[in-house]
Amino acid sequence: MPRAVLYVDLDGTVARSPMPRVIRRAYEVLASLSGLSVQQVEGVAWAIHLELASRSLPQAFDWDYIFERVASELGVRAEFSVEREFSTVCPESVALDNSPEVLRELGRSGYTLILATNGLMKYQRCVIETLGLDRYFSYIYTPDNRGCLKNCREFYAPPEGVDSGLPAVSVGDNYTFDVYFPKLFGLLTVHVVRSTREDPYLALVRRPGAGLGRLGGLDLLPEADASVRNFGESAVAVGRLLEDFHRRFRS
């Protein structure tokens, strides 16, 4: 029996892809056609993206869908495919922090590894195959096969045949999707801290009706169960968390 289920993020955690560059190019195309600045186009796209993400819809991370939505709002037409453009540069994707070796170590430690990403499979498949990451994971969870994003409880339902009573751990670099929501759903969390800047996706938990508590004018944001500086430190962090978990369970 596995010791625990680990939901491991992809982008920014175990790998970095050129997708941001492709999205930026898409916005430049729309800016050129509309006469707006790239920053203005980004603002329109972000509003659409955030609204979809607030409803946990997979289209929030369908960059071709968002491109078409923005083009429609701006009253322009453009022939641009994010998926096609990304496929030409995807081989530039790189593994971070010797992540294949870390994943191999986690697998040997008896954990069931699930690659858990908000990216759609039509974009992520190339990254996964380029870096050979599929060999380390028993399952791959994406919004298009889960029906929602990582801010919905159903995303984390264990696979068929995996004991739902096993401890579950989220490992990732995005505070909102890899720490805040997983903790809300009862998972342990390991935050791979890549930046000290505030996560812009906190806008999702600060929306009216989102239920975020406040005290003395400050948001009551839960801390990760463990924070690490890079993915390479996550194996030790996960081991310690689970030792503490089982110690509390026995007592």
Identify the function of each model-found stretch.
Residues 1-2, 100, 104, 114, ...:
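Asp-based, Mg2+/Mn2+-dependent phosphohydrolase catalytic module
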Residues 1-44:
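Active-site neighborhood of HAD-like aspartate-dependent phosphohydrolases
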Residues 19-21, 52-59, 197-210:
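Short, flexible/disordered intra-domain loops and linkers
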Residues 46-84:
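A metal-dependent, Asp-based hydrolase signature
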